[in-house]
Amino acid sequence: MVWASDLVQLGDGKPRCGWVSDDPLYRAYHDEEWGRPRRDPSALFELLILEGCQAGLSWITILRKRAHYRKVYDGFDPARVARYMPKKIESLVVDPGIVRHRGKVEASVGNARAWLALAAREDPVAFLWSFVGGAPKVNRPAGLKQVPAKTPESEALSKALAKLGFKFVGPTICYAFMQASGMVDDHVAGCACAG
């Protein structure tokens, strides 16, 4: 994607990463969530599912649907999502409040099962964070062109998750997940949220 500028100044005058729009939801996401380290298993599971659902769409589309996703996906409780039967899957596929893509809905259920299998073996939080050495990787790119779509770490995470049975976890999706979960901090230099 091409942005007009590496930084934008919205109504409050604070400089932000150039991908942020004046949409209050998007601005709050950028300021309060994106690039902030998360180690809560529920939050990480939710992000992994939502990033997969976002594939091919804009993130603001998912943000606008997130509250409804939380409702119909039982608060992203992997134990509950893993038990979804065909009737529940069909109801999700026709629900206008989420992305109505059968493959993504079915992948969400399969990913919940894969998450539970991983959790039975080891701590999923430690597993996910191990791909960045257990600590946030702060990149501080000079501009948006320096923000990669994928990295060797996201490629390794993608391969590991796929091996465990996860779907919609390609290296680009995994990098977006790493950014969203704060495993990677790619706020551009000059952004008010750049630590």
Where on the chain are the PLM-derived regions?
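HhH-family (HhH-GPD) DNA N-glycosylase catalytic core used in base-excision repair
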Residues: 1-195
